[in-house]
Amino acid sequence: MRNHSLKPSTAFGFVVLAAAGSVYAQGRGSARTDQTPIVEAVGCLSQTGSNWILTDATEAATATTTFTTPEALKAAAEKPLGTQQYRLLGTSPFSPDRHKGHKMAIKGLLIKGDSESRINVTSFQMLAETCAK
C-alpha cells in the first residue's frame, strides 16, 4: 500500500503558491497605490561609526527611474545642498569609503521613522569630489 501524504516542504509550497495567486488576483484590475516609491536625494556622504549618512541633503523626491542617466547626474550636480539627513542602508556594494566627503546623488527606498529617515540604496553616484555649500 502506497503512502499518498505530502512532504511538509511540498505542502508549504502549495500554500505559498495559493497565497501568491490570491494576492495576484486581488491586485488585478486596480493599480496599487501602496508601493514604496524610489526616491532621490543629493547631499554629502559622511560616516558615523559604521553608519553611512547623507548630510546636508535635499528633500527626498520621487525618482522617475531606478537608475541614474547622465542627464539626471548633470541636473543633480547643479542642485544646491539642503538641510535633510538620511542614514544609508545597503551601501557595502558601492564601496562608500572611496566617496567620504563627496557630493553624492543617492536613489533608493525611503524609510521614514520617528527619530530618523533612512534610504535603502539602489543607486550611488558621485557628483563632485568636494561637498561645499
Language-model regions, residue ranges each:
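Bacterial N-terminal signal peptides that target proteins for export
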Residues: 1-12
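Hydrophobic alpha-helical targeting segments used for export or membrane insertion
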Residues: 10-22
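Conserved RNA-binding domains used in RNP assembly and mRNA/RNA metabolism
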Residues: 21-133
